[in-house]
Amino acid sequence: MRVGVVVFPGSNCDRDALHAVERAGAEPVELWHADADLKGSDAVILPGGFSYGDYLRPGAIARFARVMGPLEAFAREGGPVLGVCNGFQVLCEAHLLPGALLQNRGLRFVCRRVRVRVERADTPWTAACAPGEELTLPVAHNEGNYFADPATLARLEEEGRVVLRYLENPNGSANDIAGVCSEGRNVVGLMPHPERASDPLLGSGEGLGILRSVLAGAKV
């Protein structure tokens, strides 16, 4: 399986994501922001960082990058897409996921490990996890405070589209939401960084299950 990792100007987690994809057993494919196609990728990751310097607001400019055209078509056809941190923000700006990521409660950058609970194991990106499984994953963000209007939040809960939930909310996210998925469940956005917890040598391998999920999860 080929897993593409999109590189925007200002991305800084793309190398981590490419390395983690390889460790998960897939073939990593680097996708440049100006690419006109996805190079035959079977799944795509939008990594963390500060795309285009986070000017205007995080993800607002990246949403218009050339590669986003084929990526949006891929997602709407059911292709597995994962947005991590800034990638989650880009997916919200592209309207592939509902809601928005606001500045953290407390107005400070949060950089630490957090405990999250897997709420849904029926997405391509959580198929190797168990419902209710608890993971410790790193977060590193200034705008990770998930927000949606009350009707959207109610719909996400009713439709089972909250994928990860914080056990100790680090940023003020509504309903302790750490990740959500699209109606088709193929597009997932997470604020925690599974790729930074993919090698026990670096402190944790707990995020590797999320990246390995797509190998089996592509069939979900």
From Swiss-Prot:
UniProt keyword annotations, A-Z: ATP-binding, Cytoplasm, Glutamine amidotransferase, Hydrolase, Ligase, Nucleotide-binding, Purine biosynthesis
Localization: Cytoplasm
UniProt cross-references to Gene3D superfamilies, sorted A to Z: 3.40.50.880
Signal sequence segment: none
Ranges where the Glutamine amidotransferase type-1 domain occurs: 2-220
A single cellular component GO annotation: cytoplasm
One Pfam family this sequence matches: GATase_5
GO BP of this protein: 'de novo' IMP biosynthetic process
Pathway: Purine metabolism; IMP biosynthesis via de novo pathway; 5-amino-1-(5-phospho-D-ribosyl)imidazole from N(2)-formyl-N(1)-(5-phospho-D-ribosyl)glycinamide: step 1/2
Ligase in keyword set: yes
Principal location listed in the UniProt entry: cytoplasm
GO MF terms held by the record: ATP binding; glutaminase activity; phosphoribosylformylglycinamidine synthase activity
Enzyme Commission code(s) on record: 6.3.5.3, 3.5.1.2
Physiological role: Part of the phosphoribosylformylglycinamidine synthase complex involved in the purines biosynthetic pathway. Catalyzes the ATP-dependent conversion of formylglycinamide ribonucleotide (FGAR) and glutamine to yield formylglycinamidine ribonucleotide (FGAM) and glutamate. The FGAM synthase complex is composed of three subunits. PurQ produces an ammonia molecule by converting glutamine to glutamate. PurL transfers the ammonia molecule to FGAR to form FGAM in an ATP-dependent manner.
Quaternary structure annotation from Swiss-Prot or TrEMBL: Part of the FGAM synthase complex composed of 1 PurL, 1 PurQ and 2 PurS subunits.
Protein name, per record: Phosphoribosylformylglycinamidine synthase subunit PurQ
Lineage: Bacteria, Bacillati, Actinomycetota, Rubrobacteria, Rubrobacterales
